[in-house]
UniProtKB/Swiss-Prot annotation:
TRAM domain location: 11-71
Keyword Lipoprotein: no
Binding site for [4Fe-4S] cluster: 84, 90, 93, 187
Record protein name field: Uncharacterized RNA methyltransferase CT0009
């Protein structure tokens, strides 16, 4: 007796070629679809929901397959031509191949899915994503790396002709490769003046025979180029990270930059490090020209930003984000507001103009000092900053004893979300309202589930797109204590 075809088990093997339609995004930059038989497939490649693709299976699991896309047979209507010629080789942008409208739609779905599936929130009020005014050239900070191993483009490998020397590169690390760097002339997320510095430094380094850093051998002079730009004050910071200090060389670079960009207000720094890593910071800092910092304006506040300070990388959208905190939090002039994970105090100070007192809490001592300096710079007397570990409730309680209890708490934790003990500390303070600022929808959902279990209800979630062309999304979620 023969088993009907529809009842026979379909057996997939490694190396099989399958066809499927991409239906959604998945973790680790993969996409998801199903075979005609209904088997789920995680597909690697530069894809978009709506793409019809052929893919080769490389791993067979009991409940799903993993495959690599071979060819897009029918393109998604969301697709556009990427403006960057090295998109796909550079790891900076993940979604430049789809329209900005589609990016916003994907991000809204990601926030909604996380809150529903991880947080257990039924039909959460996820508002339309607040789009960035500029989808390109929006970053106020960019870090470029220098290497003696240039990442070769596939076109060079196929033609067996090098477009540039293999032993010098200044640009971004190739995805998953800490040694090789993709040499760039232009980053389409960086400001125009940043790209000009990138090319001036490359020409200067090659002319002078400066040795690029070799990460594996821990040899070489030129390591990184870190740039910051103040949109409101039009100031540019150029920070060169090297393995040792060469005063004459830095002076020559200063003169080259000033000759190439005579109208640009600029400060030049040299961070020096002997560490065996590729991080763009140094143990020593030399100010070659200018003040050694830039000043940026958010709203009616000025913030002094040094080479290694944290500051939101999208100035215009940072204002949008902070305005949303005030709006969804319902902050009034009579309120005492606590700002957890306050860093250098940007949110705390932004809130201070709208409430009676704003108290910032941060574990990093240097960040607290920067926050206090920024409060003084702006003449704010209703702010207080504490260096404290949020995981220690009793120490927190003792430090905050002289101050009014908060009606509202704002928390802006790192990407990993709140430590369980820090979350417990926040909930023990029993604010009427919690405004949770998150750059990771999954961890917002995880922490939000615990907040809801402790007597709060989520009233809204407002996504804000801080990073166009990428799959990252910021969200401002509001939780109110149930009566």
């Amino acid at each position: 007796m023969h088993t009907p075809l529809e009842q026979q088990e379909i057996r997939y093997r490694k190396g099989d070629i399958i066809e499927l339609t991409i239906t959604d995004h998945a973790e680790k930059d993969k996409c998801f679809g199903k075979t005609t038989e209904g088997m789920g497939v995680m597909v690697s490649g530069i894809l978009a929901p709506g793409d019809r693709v052929s893919a080769q299976i490389y791993k067979v699991k009991s409940r799903y397959l993993e495959a690599r896309a071979i060819e897009v047979l029918e393109a998604s209507p969301d697709r556009v031509e990427p403006v960057c010629p090295v998109f796909g080789s550079c790891g900076g942008c993940k979604w430049m191949h789809v329209s900005y409208e589609a990016q916003l739609r994907y991000k809204h779905k990601k926030v909604t899915d996380s809150l529903e599936h991880i947080g257990g929130f039924e039909s959460p009020d996820v508002r339309p994503v607040l789009a960035a005014p500029d989808a390109l050239h929006y970053r106020n900070k960019v870090e470029f790396s220098c290497s003696n191993m240039r990442y070769l483009l596939q076109s060079e490998i196929d033609s067996d002709q090098l477009a540039k020397p293999k032993t010098f590169a200044l640009g971004f690390h190739a995805p998953g490769n800490f040694e090789k760097v993709l040499d760039l002339d232009t980053c389409y997320l960086a400001k125009e003046c940043m790209n000009r510095v990138l090319n001036v430094l490359r020409d200067f380094a090659i002319e002078r025979g400066l040795e690029p850093y070799a990460a594996k051998a821990h040899e070489g002079y030129l390591r990184n180029l870190m740039l910051r730009y103040s949109e409101r004050h039009e100031q540019l910071m150029v920070n060169i990270v090297t393995s040792w200090y060469d005063k004459a060389l830095m002076q020559a670079l200063k003169e080259r930059l000033e000759a190439a960009m005579p109208e640009q207000q600029m400060t030049l720094l040299n961070n020096v490090t002997t560490r065996k890593n590729t991080v763009a910071t140094g143990e020593q800092e030399y100010v070659i020209s200018g003040d050694g910092y830039v000043t940026e304006r958010l709203g009616d506040l000025d913030f002094r930003i040094s080479a290694n300070s944290f500051f939101q990388t999208n100035t215009r959208q940072a204002e949008t984000l902070y305005d949303q905190i005030i709006a969804v939090g319902g902050i009034t002039p009579e309120d005492t507001v606590y700002d957890l994970y306050c860093g250098t105090g940007t949110i705390t100070l932004y809130l201070a103009r709208h409430c009676k007192q704003a108290i910032g809490i941060e574990v990093v001592e240097s960040a607290v000092k920067d926050a206090e300096m920024n409060a003084e710079l702006n003449g704010l007397s209703n702010t207080v900053f504490f260096q404290a570990d949020l995981k220690n409730f009793h120490a927190m309680q003792e430090a905050l004893e002289p101050y009014a209890k908060p009606r509202i708490i704002v928390t802006d934790p790192p990407r990993a979300g709140m430590h369980p003990k820090a979350l417990d500390t926040m909930l023990k303070l029993q604010p009427e309202r919690i405004v949770y600022v998150s750059c990771n929808p999954d961890n917002l959902a995880r922490d939000g589930k615990e907040i809801a279990a402790r007597g709060y209800r989520m009233t809204s979630a407002q996504p804000v797109d801080m990073f166009p062309q990428t799959n990252h999304i910021e969200t401002v979620a509001c939780f109110e204590r149930a009566e």
